[in-house]
Amino acid sequence: MSEFDRLTDPATMKGLSFEEQTYEVSRRLAALTRRRFLAGSGALLATAGAAMPAFAQRKGGNLRIGRSSDPDTLDPQKTTSFTSHETFTQIFDGMVMRDEKGNVLPHLALSWEFQNDNKRVVFKLRPDVVFHDGTPLNAEAVAFTVKRHLDPATASPTKFICGPLTHAEVIDDLTIAYVYSAPFVTLWVGLGGAYQAILSPAAVQKLGNDFGRNPVGSGPFKFEKWQPDSGIKLVRNDKHMFINKRFKNDKPAHLDSIEYVVIPEDAPRLAALQSNEIQVIAGFNAVPLDKLAQVKRMRNVKLMQRTALSCFGLCFNTKLTPTSDLKVRQALSMAIDKNKVMQLALGGNGELAYSPLGPAFPQVLPNAKELAPKYDPAKAKALLQEAGATNLKLRLSTGDDGANRRACEVIQAELKAVGVEVAIEAVPGAEAAVIGRKGEHPLYMLNYRYTDGDVLHILLHKTGALNRGFYTDPRTDDLLDKQRLEFDPKKRDAMINEVQKIAIEQCWWLPLYADVTAVAIRDTVQDFENAWDARIYYKDVWLKA
């Protein structure tokens, strides 16, 4: 255990309140800072509440980012993890990017042309791009990446993002065609994210299954090392010189390096920010939403927040008894006060949801609230009696981050009030995903972030990668397939609305709330953007004196 881990270990602070833990860790880290300084280590770290300069110039420096958990892998084709995506977004480049209005921005692809009734897209690639291992990023590399993503042997959980993509065809060294079996209106959602980023063929072939622990891309930062349950270090890629409208900087990143530091517990993580052991807390659930008031009171710390394109909800497993019964699903939905869940899980920092499509999505069903089951414990008890579902004992699987744990504890108490006993199984996010895919529990806490209503295909289609309720409904599948082919926005939105109506009527989900994307940064951190799509890029970030 490192000195930092030892000083922030919650086991040494048993019996202390959250605020007392934060203070105690701040005190310890301040003492550590003084010892480092007196020992001549050169680590000029500001003590809690002080405004001591961290770095003296725009170029250079190491940025330390606090997070709650480790990724499961850094192979973009082998995970759906938010934490992984946050990391390999820095390491890899995608074909395009998108702005807040949905406009498609050139990135690796400088231009594109739709052909063959929108079933073929020809991309012109940026010249002179190389991977971190020195090999060229050309059409062959793109074709290799696509082939691997689609290969059943890869068993990619993000293959669904590719839609009806069948293969990529090399035209010349800098021209590549993506060939689809049908028009695919949401292709930019995937191509604009890191799950479809371009991989180094040489590195994949050399490393095999170890590629996810030693990723090689072409992005603004290169992978250097990974110490499990401790942190990941990336260093600047001095050959990343290109720009699009999401980047201000057309030269290599300002920072020498960035480190992701794993601090599982909220109080030590906030204390590390207060004492300048870390300069940023960012990423999924990294800033505890029930503690935003405390973060706002921190000196020399800036809190950035915005409503997320997200939804947190309780999935009912329709292949298991008793949640295969619609009356039971309705009863469980009516027994839970989702406002109470949001207040205690997020400190009220969210927006209630009534559809599996989160409230911040433009395509959310306008009358979802009117159609959704109302909180009514008495009616919930009556429905359980009608269904013959008495003395129920159910297992609820969830990731072990603070917000999800708190939400599940409220759900547990609410269901106990109507005679349902719930055993919570809280495990690290990667393990929870495995449990969810196996479908061994009747209840599963699920959340997502996405940028388009096509997320319903992922959640509710029989082939959906996040269909944790194992729903199978031919009409829903047909609508979800057709909306992917419909280029008329009004017609497509009508299909997405119809799917939401079915999902609400069938109680496949109990939508709870959308959270906010919250980031806390030291005031030395400049040009940091809390982006609309929750994708954080560190290429523009710099540290001031």
Language-model-detected regions and their locations in the chain:
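Extracytoplasmic/peripheral linker and loop segments enriched in polar/acidic and small residues
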Residues: 119, 327, 421-432, 457-523, ...
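N-terminal lobe/hinge region of extracytoplasmic solute-binding protein
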Residues: 66-116, 147, 216
